[in-house]
């Protein structure tokens, strides 16, 4: 029997018209300046088209024996550009679910990580609760095993993972494309930096398609969750609208 879903991340896209004077290069450098604590990218391939995004969520980062991942969840808007002084129970609970998931997944490989946090961390126009996890991975050939265990994280899917994944596929109603995948540099013999592809956009000839999502718990207020996705979409909308 399927287990009950106790966290679910649903997302949406928003398409806006592109100004004829838009420059991807200028937008990228504007994003780099604005989102200094995020991984910012501008990527084009014939297969994927052109994508740009900024994400604060490390999926897996490290080299040799030293590795890191993060639990990033809970969202509040900045107040006068400052981090919040307190968080409600719903946001704490959401972040703790992600942290517990990471501990549990790593433990299947015999890994007990060192932890730092949770603490408030800025990401564009919003803030999140963040915990850092540091661990050793003597055999770099295990990178694929770690990635398979961590992805998709509860920050983009839900818990239990399989039940949430199938609910999203059957009910979300659109194709996420590359949103909520992971992006970065993978080098088992050198430095690897992989991030969850959160706030992002697909740059098309006449339009941008922006993507964002929000985590739903039993205590969630739907109007607040909708506004959270608006705040996240604003992160990218400000970049393309203020050049």
PLM segments and residue spans:
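A glycine-rich phosphate-binding loop feature that marks nucleotide/adenosyl-phosphate handling sites
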Residues: 12-15, 45-51, 102-103, 118-126, ...
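Contiguous alpha-helical scaffold segments within structured protein domains
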Residues: 17, 68-170, 241
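Short acidic/polar active-site loop segments enriched in Thr and Asp
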Residues: 6
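A short glycine-rich, hydrophobically flanked beta-strand micro-motif that places a catalytic Asp/Glu
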Residues: 10, 41-42, 111, 176-184
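Short, small-residue-biased leader/transition segments that mark boundaries at the very start
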Residues: 1-3
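An anion-binding catalytic pocket shared by soluble metabolic enzymes
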Residues: 12, 16-97, 190-213
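Conserved hydrophobic core element of enzyme catalytic domains
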Residues: 136-243
């Amino acid at each position: 029997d399927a287990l009950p879903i106790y966290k679910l991340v649903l997302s949406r896209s928003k398409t806006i018209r592109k100004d004829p004077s838009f420059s991807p290069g200028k937008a990228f450098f504007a994003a780099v300046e604005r989102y200094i604590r995020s991984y910012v990218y501008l990527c084009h391939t014939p297969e994927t088209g052109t994508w740009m995004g900024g994400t604060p969520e490390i999926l897996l980062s490290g080299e040799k024996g030293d590795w890191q991942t993060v639990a990033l969840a809970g969202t509040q808007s900045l107040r006068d550009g400052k981090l919040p002084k307190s968080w409600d129970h719903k946001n704490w609970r959401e972040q703790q679910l992600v942290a517990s998931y990471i501990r549990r997944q790593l433990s299947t490989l015999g890994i007990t990580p060192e932890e730092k946090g949770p603490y408030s961390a800025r990401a564009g126009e919003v803030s999140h609760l963040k915990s850092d996890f540091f661990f050793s991975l003597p055999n770099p050939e295990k990178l694929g095993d770690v990635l398979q265990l961590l992805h998709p994280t509860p920050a983009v899917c839900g818990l239990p993972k399989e039940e949430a994944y199938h609910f999203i596929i059957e009910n979300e109603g659109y194709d996420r494309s590359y949103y909520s995948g992971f992006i970065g540099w993978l080098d088992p013999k050198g430095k690897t930096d992989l991030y969850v592809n959160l706030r992002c956009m697909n740059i098309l000839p006449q339009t941008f398609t922006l993507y964002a999502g929000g985590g739903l718990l039993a205590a969630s207020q739907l109007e607040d969750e909708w506004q959270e996705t608006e705040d996240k979409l604003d992160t990218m909308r400000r970049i393309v609208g203020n050049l």
